[in-house]
From Swiss-Prot:
Name under which the protein is recorded: D-amino acid dehydrogenase
Signal sequence, start to end: none
Binding sites annotated in the UniProt record for FAD: 3-17
Obligatory cofactor(s): FAD
GO terms classed as biological process: D-alanine catabolic process
Gene giving rise to this polypeptide: dadA
Record Pfam families: DAO (PF01266)
Assigned protein family: Belongs to the DadA oxidoreductase family.
Protein role: Oxidative deamination of D-amino acids.
Keyword Oxidoreductase part of the UniProt annotation: yes
Highest taxon in the source lineage: Bacteria
Gene Ontology CC terms: cytoplasm; plasma membrane
HAMAP family, sorted: DadA (MF_01202)
Assigned keywords, A-Z: FAD, Flavoprotein, Oxidoreductase
Lineage, highest ranks first: Bacteria, Pseudomonadati, Pseudomonadota, Alphaproteobacteria, Hyphomicrobiales
Length: 416
Protein backbone atom coordinates (compact mmCIF):
# COMPACT_ATOMS: atom_id res chain seq x y z
CA UNK A 1 0.00 0.00 0.00
CA UNK A 2 0.95 3.61 -0.50
CA UNK A 3 1.02 5.16 2.99
CA UNK A 4 1.56 8.81 3.89
CA UNK A 5 2.76 9.70 7.38
CA UNK A 6 2.03 13.28 8.40
CA UNK A 7 4.70 14.59 10.74
CA UNK A 8 8.43 13.88 11.06
CA UNK A 9 8.76 14.02 14.82
CA UNK A 10 9.80 10.94 16.77
CA UNK A 11 6.32 9.42 16.38
CA UNK A 12 6.21 10.01 12.62
CA UNK A 13 9.76 8.79 11.98
CA UNK A 14 9.36 5.57 13.97
CA UNK A 15 5.97 4.96 12.34
CA UNK A 16 7.44 5.42 8.86
CA UNK A 17 10.29 3.04 9.62
CA UNK A 18 7.99 0.27 10.85
CA UNK A 19 5.51 0.77 8.01
CA UNK A 20 8.33 0.47 5.50
CA UNK A 21 9.56 -2.71 7.17
CA UNK A 22 6.00 -4.03 6.86
CA UNK A 23 6.29 -3.69 3.09
CA UNK A 24 4.50 -0.42 2.41
CA UNK A 25 5.53 2.44 0.12
CA UNK A 26 5.93 5.26 2.63
CA UNK A 27 6.15 9.05 2.30
CA UNK A 28 6.62 11.37 5.29
CA UNK A 29 5.46 14.98 4.97
CA UNK A 30 6.56 17.73 7.35
CA UNK A 31 6.73 21.53 7.23
CA UNK A 32 10.19 21.62 8.82
CA UNK A 33 13.47 21.21 6.85
CA UNK A 34 14.35 17.98 8.68
CA UNK A 35 13.17 15.43 11.25
CA UNK A 36 12.45 16.08 14.93
CA UNK A 37 12.69 19.86 14.76
CA UNK A 38 9.65 20.69 16.90
CA UNK A 39 8.51 18.87 20.06
CA UNK A 40 11.07 16.07 19.62
CA UNK A 41 14.03 18.45 19.31
CA UNK A 42 15.10 19.02 22.93
CA UNK A 43 12.78 17.08 25.20
CA UNK A 44 13.88 15.92 28.65
CA UNK A 45 15.74 12.92 27.23
CA UNK A 46 14.15 10.38 29.55
CA UNK A 47 12.90 7.08 28.15
CA UNK A 48 10.83 6.27 31.20
CA UNK A 49 8.99 3.00 30.80
CA UNK A 50 8.36 2.69 34.55
CA UNK A 51 7.98 6.38 35.41
CA UNK A 52 4.84 6.60 33.34
CA UNK A 53 1.83 8.28 34.96
CA UNK A 54 -1.19 10.32 33.89
CA UNK A 55 -1.14 13.94 34.89
CA UNK A 56 -4.81 13.53 35.79
CA UNK A 57 -4.49 12.03 39.27
CA UNK A 58 -6.26 12.19 42.63
CA UNK A 59 -5.31 15.37 44.45
CA UNK A 60 -4.06 17.18 41.36
CA UNK A 61 -6.84 19.85 41.32
CA UNK A 62 -5.86 21.02 44.83
CA UNK A 63 -2.14 20.80 44.03
CA UNK A 64 -2.72 22.84 40.88
CA UNK A 65 -4.26 25.66 42.89
CA UNK A 66 -1.21 25.68 45.19
CA UNK A 67 1.22 25.57 42.26
CA UNK A 68 -0.32 28.69 40.74
CA UNK A 69 1.15 30.71 43.61
CA UNK A 70 4.60 29.07 43.79
CA UNK A 71 7.68 30.96 42.61
CA UNK A 72 9.04 27.92 40.75
CA UNK A 73 5.70 26.37 39.87
CA UNK A 74 5.50 23.19 37.76
CA UNK A 75 2.17 24.41 36.34
CA UNK A 76 1.47 27.70 34.59
CA UNK A 77 -2.08 28.41 33.46
CA UNK A 78 -2.85 31.26 31.06
CA UNK A 79 -6.63 30.98 30.59
CA UNK A 80 -8.22 32.33 27.44
CA UNK A 81 -11.52 32.16 25.61
CA UNK A 82 -10.77 28.87 23.92
CA UNK A 83 -13.43 26.17 23.74
CA UNK A 84 -10.85 23.46 23.05
CA UNK A 85 -8.82 24.44 26.12
CA UNK A 86 -11.85 24.55 28.41
CA UNK A 87 -13.21 21.24 27.11
CA UNK A 88 -9.82 19.57 27.53
CA UNK A 89 -9.41 20.87 31.08
CA UNK A 90 -12.90 19.68 32.04
CA UNK A 91 -12.18 16.21 30.66
CA UNK A 92 -8.86 16.12 32.50
CA UNK A 93 -10.54 17.00 35.80
CA UNK A 94 -13.03 14.18 35.27
CA UNK A 95 -10.07 11.77 35.09
CA UNK A 96 -8.68 12.86 38.48
CA UNK A 97 -10.28 9.98 40.36
CA UNK A 98 -8.62 6.90 41.81
CA UNK A 99 -10.54 4.60 39.48
CA UNK A 100 -9.74 6.53 36.31
CA UNK A 101 -6.12 7.00 37.37
CA UNK A 102 -5.67 3.24 37.80
CA UNK A 103 -7.22 2.48 34.39
CA UNK A 104 -5.20 5.14 32.59
CA UNK A 105 -1.89 4.28 34.25
CA UNK A 106 -2.35 0.60 33.41
CA UNK A 107 -2.88 1.49 29.73
CA UNK A 108 0.21 3.67 29.72
CA UNK A 109 2.38 1.05 31.39
CA UNK A 110 1.22 -1.60 28.92
CA UNK A 111 2.25 0.51 25.95
CA UNK A 112 5.44 1.72 27.64
CA UNK A 113 6.58 -1.81 28.43
CA UNK A 114 5.91 -2.85 24.84
CA UNK A 115 7.94 0.17 23.73
CA UNK A 116 10.80 -0.94 25.96
CA UNK A 117 11.16 -4.27 24.15
CA UNK A 118 10.49 -2.61 20.79
CA UNK A 119 13.23 -0.03 21.31
CA UNK A 120 15.67 -2.73 22.40
CA UNK A 121 14.93 -4.70 19.23
CA UNK A 122 15.25 -1.59 17.08
CA UNK A 123 18.55 -0.65 18.68
CA UNK A 124 19.93 -4.12 18.03
CA UNK A 125 18.64 -4.09 14.46
CA UNK A 126 19.99 -0.66 13.50
CA UNK A 127 23.01 -0.18 15.84
CA UNK A 128 21.94 3.47 16.27
CA UNK A 129 23.74 5.43 19.00
CA UNK A 130 22.16 8.48 20.60
CA UNK A 131 23.93 9.21 23.93
CA UNK A 132 21.92 6.34 25.39
CA UNK A 133 22.26 5.09 28.96
CA UNK A 134 20.42 2.21 30.65
CA UNK A 135 20.70 3.12 34.32
CA UNK A 136 17.11 3.81 35.34
CA UNK A 137 15.03 6.75 36.50
CA UNK A 138 15.17 7.98 40.08
CA UNK A 139 12.02 9.76 41.23
CA UNK A 140 13.42 11.96 44.00
CA UNK A 141 11.35 12.94 47.04
CA UNK A 142 12.27 15.94 49.14
CA UNK A 143 9.46 15.40 51.70
CA UNK A 144 7.90 12.47 53.56
CA UNK A 145 4.53 13.46 52.10
CA UNK A 146 5.87 12.93 48.57
CA UNK A 147 7.26 9.55 49.57
CA UNK A 148 3.94 8.50 51.09
CA UNK A 149 2.03 9.69 48.00
CA UNK A 150 4.09 7.37 45.79
CA UNK A 151 2.17 4.36 47.17
CA UNK A 152 -0.40 4.46 44.35
CA UNK A 153 2.36 4.41 41.73
CA UNK A 154 4.12 1.55 43.48
CA UNK A 155 0.87 -0.45 43.50
CA UNK A 156 0.43 0.11 39.76
CA UNK A 157 4.02 -0.91 39.02
CA UNK A 158 3.61 -4.07 41.08
CA UNK A 159 0.29 -4.94 39.42
CA UNK A 160 1.84 -4.62 35.95
CA UNK A 161 5.03 -6.46 36.82
CA UNK A 162 7.30 -3.43 36.31
CA UNK A 163 10.53 -3.67 38.37
CA UNK A 164 11.03 -0.94 40.98
CA UNK A 165 13.01 -0.20 44.14
CA UNK A 166 11.97 2.07 47.01
CA UNK A 167 15.14 3.79 48.23
CA UNK A 168 16.02 5.61 51.42
CA UNK A 169 18.36 8.59 51.43
CA UNK A 170 21.49 6.44 51.28
CA UNK A 171 20.01 4.33 48.49
CA UNK A 172 19.40 7.46 46.42
CA UNK A 173 23.01 8.50 46.92
CA UNK A 174 24.24 5.08 45.82
CA UNK A 175 22.17 5.42 42.65
CA UNK A 176 23.24 9.03 42.07
CA UNK A 177 26.50 9.72 43.96
CA UNK A 178 26.39 13.47 43.31
CA UNK A 179 23.39 13.69 45.65
CA UNK A 180 25.76 13.01 48.57
CA UNK A 181 26.50 16.71 48.88
CA UNK A 182 22.77 17.56 49.29
CA UNK A 183 21.71 14.55 51.40
CA UNK A 184 19.79 16.78 53.83
CA UNK A 185 17.52 17.96 51.00
CA UNK A 186 16.18 14.49 50.16
CA UNK A 187 14.27 11.82 52.07
CA UNK A 188 14.10 8.97 49.56
CA UNK A 189 13.19 7.92 46.06
CA UNK A 190 11.58 5.43 43.73
CA UNK A 191 13.93 3.81 41.21
CA UNK A 192 12.64 2.19 38.02
CA UNK A 193 15.80 0.37 36.87
CA UNK A 194 14.61 -0.56 33.36
CA UNK A 195 14.27 3.08 32.34
CA UNK A 196 16.74 4.63 29.92
CA UNK A 197 17.95 8.00 28.71
CA UNK A 198 18.92 9.25 25.29
CA UNK A 199 18.90 12.13 22.83
CA UNK A 200 15.59 11.93 20.97
CA UNK A 201 16.75 14.30 18.22
CA UNK A 202 19.86 12.23 17.50
CA UNK A 203 17.84 9.02 17.47
CA UNK A 204 15.14 10.40 15.15
CA UNK A 205 17.70 11.70 12.67
CA UNK A 206 19.62 8.43 12.63
CA UNK A 207 16.43 6.38 12.21
CA UNK A 208 15.22 8.68 9.43
CA UNK A 209 18.47 7.91 7.63
CA UNK A 210 17.86 4.18 8.04
CA UNK A 211 14.29 4.63 6.82
CA UNK A 212 15.49 6.42 3.68
CA UNK A 213 17.72 3.45 2.91
CA UNK A 214 14.61 1.26 3.13
CA UNK A 215 12.94 3.49 0.53
CA UNK A 216 10.98 5.93 2.69
CA UNK A 217 10.61 9.33 1.02
CA UNK A 218 10.83 12.38 3.30
CA UNK A 219 9.10 15.43 1.87
CA UNK A 220 10.40 18.25 4.07
CA UNK A 221 9.51 21.93 3.89
CA UNK A 222 5.97 21.07 2.85
CA UNK A 223 2.85 22.55 4.41
CA UNK A 224 -0.05 20.15 4.97
CA UNK A 225 -3.24 21.87 3.86
CA UNK A 226 -5.99 19.23 4.09
CA UNK A 227 -6.94 15.59 3.88
CA UNK A 228 -8.62 14.41 0.72
CA UNK A 229 -11.67 12.39 1.77
CA UNK A 230 -14.46 11.05 -0.42
CA UNK A 231 -17.05 8.36 0.12
CA UNK A 232 -15.99 7.83 3.72
CA UNK A 233 -12.40 6.99 2.73
CA UNK A 234 -9.16 8.96 2.67
CA UNK A 235 -7.58 9.22 -0.77
CA UNK A 236 -4.64 11.51 -0.16
CA UNK A 237 -3.31 14.77 1.21
CA UNK A 238 -3.37 18.30 -0.19
CA UNK A 239 -0.07 20.10 0.43
CA UNK A 240 1.67 23.34 -0.50
CA UNK A 241 3.39 21.35 -3.27
CA UNK A 242 0.25 19.76 -4.63
CA UNK A 243 -1.81 16.62 -4.08
CA UNK A 244 -0.30 13.39 -2.75
CA UNK A 245 -2.34 10.23 -3.34
CA UNK A 246 -2.45 7.51 -0.68
CA UNK A 247 -4.21 4.30 0.27
CA UNK A 248 -3.73 5.11 3.96
CA UNK A 249 -2.72 8.18 5.96
CA UNK A 250 -1.24 8.22 9.47
CA UNK A 251 -1.67 11.52 11.33
CA UNK A 252 1.32 12.05 13.65
CA UNK A 253 1.21 15.82 13.93
CA UNK A 254 1.31 16.08 17.71
CA UNK A 255 -0.66 19.05 19.04
CA UNK A 256 -1.70 20.03 15.52
CA UNK A 257 -3.46 16.73 14.80
CA UNK A 258 -6.93 17.90 15.97
CA UNK A 259 -6.80 20.92 13.66
CA UNK A 260 -6.43 18.68 10.61
CA UNK A 261 -9.14 16.11 11.37
CA UNK A 262 -11.89 18.19 13.00
CA UNK A 263 -13.54 19.20 9.71
CA UNK A 264 -14.47 15.53 9.29
CA UNK A 265 -16.28 15.38 12.62
CA UNK A 266 -13.37 13.73 14.44
CA UNK A 267 -13.20 15.31 17.89
CA UNK A 268 -9.67 14.51 18.98
CA UNK A 269 -9.13 15.68 22.59
CA UNK A 270 -5.47 16.60 22.21
CA UNK A 271 -4.31 20.00 23.43
CA UNK A 272 -0.84 21.60 23.53
CA UNK A 273 0.86 21.84 26.91
CA UNK A 274 4.11 23.74 26.61
CA UNK A 275 7.22 22.30 28.18
CA UNK A 276 10.67 23.84 28.57
CA UNK A 277 14.19 22.49 28.59
CA UNK A 278 17.69 23.75 29.26
CA UNK A 279 20.71 21.89 27.88
CA UNK A 280 23.95 22.72 29.65
CA UNK A 281 27.55 21.52 29.22
CA UNK A 282 29.04 19.53 32.10
CA UNK A 283 31.89 21.32 33.85
CA UNK A 284 32.32 18.86 36.75
CA UNK A 285 31.19 15.27 36.13
CA UNK A 286 31.39 14.42 39.85
CA UNK A 287 28.49 16.80 40.46
CA UNK A 288 26.38 15.70 37.49
CA UNK A 289 23.69 13.00 37.32
CA UNK A 290 24.42 9.48 36.15
CA UNK A 291 21.02 8.93 34.53
CA UNK A 292 17.62 10.64 34.92
CA UNK A 293 16.43 12.16 38.18
CA UNK A 294 12.84 13.36 38.49
CA UNK A 295 12.65 16.22 40.99
CA UNK A 296 9.18 15.56 42.38
CA UNK A 297 8.92 19.00 43.98
CA UNK A 298 9.23 20.90 40.70
CA UNK A 299 8.16 18.07 38.34
CA UNK A 300 11.42 18.50 36.46
CA UNK A 301 13.59 15.81 34.85
CA UNK A 302 17.36 16.16 35.08
CA UNK A 303 19.04 13.86 32.55
CA UNK A 304 22.61 13.00 31.63
CA UNK A 305 23.15 13.07 27.85
CA UNK A 306 26.82 12.35 27.20
CA UNK A 307 28.76 15.46 28.18
CA UNK A 308 25.57 17.49 28.65
CA UNK A 309 22.79 17.78 31.23
CA UNK A 310 19.25 18.20 29.90
CA UNK A 311 16.81 19.77 32.36
CA UNK A 312 13.21 19.59 31.23
CA UNK A 313 9.72 19.93 32.54
CA UNK A 314 6.90 22.24 33.62
CA UNK A 315 3.47 22.48 32.11
CA UNK A 316 2.23 25.72 30.63
CA UNK A 317 -1.33 25.70 29.35
CA UNK A 318 -1.42 28.71 27.05
CA UNK A 319 -2.59 27.51 23.65
CA UNK A 320 -0.40 27.29 20.57
CA UNK A 321 2.25 29.76 21.73
CA UNK A 322 5.92 28.84 21.66
CA UNK A 323 7.50 31.91 23.22
CA UNK A 324 10.25 31.49 25.81
CA UNK A 325 9.53 32.84 29.30
CA UNK A 326 12.68 33.83 31.18
CA UNK A 327 11.03 32.90 34.49
CA UNK A 328 10.77 29.31 33.25
CA UNK A 329 14.52 29.26 32.60
CA UNK A 330 15.15 30.41 36.16
CA UNK A 331 13.04 27.51 37.45
CA UNK A 332 15.04 24.98 35.43
CA UNK A 333 18.32 26.50 36.60
CA UNK A 334 17.14 26.49 40.21
CA UNK A 335 16.21 22.80 40.14
CA UNK A 336 19.39 21.52 38.50
CA UNK A 337 21.85 23.74 40.36
CA UNK A 338 20.21 22.89 43.67
CA UNK A 339 20.86 19.16 43.14
CA UNK A 340 23.54 18.83 40.45
CA UNK A 341 25.69 21.98 40.18
CA UNK A 342 28.15 20.26 37.86
CA UNK A 343 26.89 22.04 34.76
CA UNK A 344 27.57 25.51 33.40
CA UNK A 345 24.04 26.94 33.40
CA UNK A 346 25.16 30.27 31.92
CA UNK A 347 26.08 28.44 28.70
CA UNK A 348 22.77 26.59 28.56
CA UNK A 349 20.56 26.37 25.48
CA UNK A 350 16.95 27.25 26.34
CA UNK A 351 14.05 25.69 24.39
CA UNK A 352 10.30 25.13 24.47
CA UNK A 353 8.00 22.66 22.75
CA UNK A 354 4.29 21.91 22.60
CA UNK A 355 3.46 18.52 24.06
CA UNK A 356 0.30 16.92 22.62
CA UNK A 357 -1.65 15.97 25.75
CA UNK A 358 -4.81 13.93 26.08
CA UNK A 359 -7.02 14.45 29.15
CA UNK A 360 -6.45 10.87 30.34
CA UNK A 361 -2.70 10.76 29.61
CA UNK A 362 -2.96 7.88 27.14
CA UNK A 363 -2.07 8.51 23.49
CA UNK A 364 -4.57 8.01 20.68
CA UNK A 365 -3.42 5.21 18.37
CA UNK A 366 -5.66 3.51 15.87
CA UNK A 367 -8.26 3.85 13.12
CA UNK A 368 -10.89 6.55 12.73
CA UNK A 369 -14.40 6.61 11.27
CA UNK A 370 -12.78 7.43 7.91
CA UNK A 371 -11.47 4.30 6.19
CA UNK A 372 -7.71 4.37 5.73
CA UNK A 373 -7.18 7.26 8.16
CA UNK A 374 -5.20 6.42 11.30
CA UNK A 375 -4.04 8.41 14.32
CA UNK A 376 -0.77 8.13 16.23
CA UNK A 377 -0.70 11.18 18.46
CA UNK A 378 -1.37 12.56 21.95
CA UNK A 379 1.66 11.07 23.72
CA UNK A 380 2.19 14.16 25.89
CA UNK A 381 5.51 14.04 27.73
CA UNK A 382 6.05 10.40 26.76
CA UNK A 383 6.42 10.50 22.99
CA UNK A 384 10.08 9.47 23.15
CA UNK A 385 9.27 6.76 25.68
CA UNK A 386 6.32 5.30 23.77
CA UNK A 387 7.42 5.91 20.18
CA UNK A 388 8.84 2.49 19.32
CA UNK A 389 5.86 0.54 20.61
CA UNK A 390 3.36 2.99 19.12
CA UNK A 391 5.04 2.63 15.73
CA UNK A 392 4.72 -1.14 15.79
CA UNK A 393 1.06 -0.91 16.82
CA UNK A 394 0.23 1.50 13.99
CA UNK A 395 2.17 -0.56 11.44
CA UNK A 396 0.24 -3.68 12.44
CA UNK A 397 -3.09 -1.85 12.30
CA UNK A 398 -2.44 -0.35 8.86
CA UNK A 399 -1.21 -3.74 7.62
CA UNK A 400 -4.24 -5.51 9.15
CA UNK A 401 -1.92 -7.83 11.08
CA UNK A 402 -2.47 -9.37 14.48
CA UNK A 403 -1.25 -7.02 17.21
CA UNK A 404 1.25 -8.12 19.85
CA UNK A 405 -0.55 -6.17 22.59
CA UNK A 406 -4.16 -5.17 23.20
CA UNK A 407 -4.57 -1.71 21.67
CA UNK A 408 -8.37 -1.42 21.54
CA UNK A 409 -8.46 1.05 24.43
CA UNK A 410 -5.83 3.25 22.77
CA UNK A 411 -8.12 4.19 19.86
CA UNK A 412 -10.17 7.38 19.69
CA UNK A 413 -13.33 5.29 20.14
CA UNK A 414 -12.68 5.30 23.91
CA UNK A 415 -13.90 8.89 24.02
CA UNK A 416 -17.30 7.91 22.61
Amino acid sequence: MKVIVLGAGIIGVTSAYQLSRAGHEVTVIDRQPGPALETSFANAGEVSFGYCSPWAAPGIPMKALKWLFMQHAPLILRPRIDAAMLSWMAKMLSNCTSRRYAVNKSRMLRLADYSRTSLAALREETAITYDERMQGTLQLFRTEAQLDASAKDISALAADGIPYEVLDRDGCIRAEPALGRVRDKIVGGLLTPQDETGDCFKFANALAGRAEKLGVCFDYGTEIRALEVDGGRVHGVVTSKGRRAADAVVVALGSYSPLLVRRFGIRLPVYPVKGYSLTIPIADASRAPVSTVMDETYKIAITRLGDRIRVGGMAEISGYTNDLGIARRRTLEHSVMDLFPGGDAAKGSFWSGLRPMTPDGTPVIGPTRIAGLFLNTGHGTLGWTMSSGSARVIADLVSDRKLEIDATDLAIARYG
